[in-house]
């Protein structure tokens, strides 16, 4: 697992992006072991544009929600990313019987969907 990177230093005239991952709602949320989110920036051919980042394990699990409440800082300025890039979010958890980490679901935001403020993604 790779950790969340620190916020990059500001660059004059460039736009930096930080995304707060608050929670994910799943009907069987309490059953997932060591759940976390992986965030990756990829080009239009799904080629990684920077190293992926993993949130720490969720801070809380309830009946139908898993709470992360973590900020992820994209390490490149928006202007330096190629047209058509997207930010991918993968919900992962540990499966003890198989002794591996599994991806349960994922979603992505395309470049033209980025905006300031809250955004809910369907995974």
Question: Can you say where each PLM-predicted feature lies in the sequence?
Answer:
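C2/C2-like lipid-binding beta-sandwich modules
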Residues: 1-41, 74-79
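C2-type phospholipid-binding modules
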Residues: 8, 86-123
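Helix-boundary capping/turn motifs
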Residues: 10-14, 43-47, 61-66, 80-83
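Hydrophobic residues positioned within well-ordered beta-strands of beta-sheet architectures
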Residues: 17, 35-37, 70, 87, ...
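Eukaryotic short linear interaction motifs
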Residues: 26-31, 40, 44-49, 80-83, ...
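Short Trp-Ser/Thr-centered turn/loop motifs at beta-strand boundaries
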Residues: 47-63, 69, 104-106
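Low-complexity, flexible helical/coil segments
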Residues: 50-58, 73-78, 110, 123
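Eukaryote-biased detector of low-complexity, proline/serine/threonine-rich segments
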Residues: 64-101
């Amino acid at each position: 697992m790779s950790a969340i990177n620190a916020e990059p230093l500001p660059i004059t005239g460039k736009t930096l992006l930080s995304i707060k991952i608050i929670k994910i709602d799943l009907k069987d949320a309490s059953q997932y072991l060591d759940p976390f989110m992986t965030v990756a920036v990829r080009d239009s051919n799904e080629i990684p544009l920077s190293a992926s980042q993993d949130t720490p394990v969720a801070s809380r699990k309830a009946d139908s929600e898993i709470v992360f409440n973590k900020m992820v800082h994209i390490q490149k300025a928006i202007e330096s990313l190629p047209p058509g890039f997207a930010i991918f979010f993968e919900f992962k958890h540990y499966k003890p019987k198989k002794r591996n980490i599994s991806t349960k679901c994922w979603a992505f935001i395309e470049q033209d969907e980025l905006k300031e403020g809250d955004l809910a993604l369907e995974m």
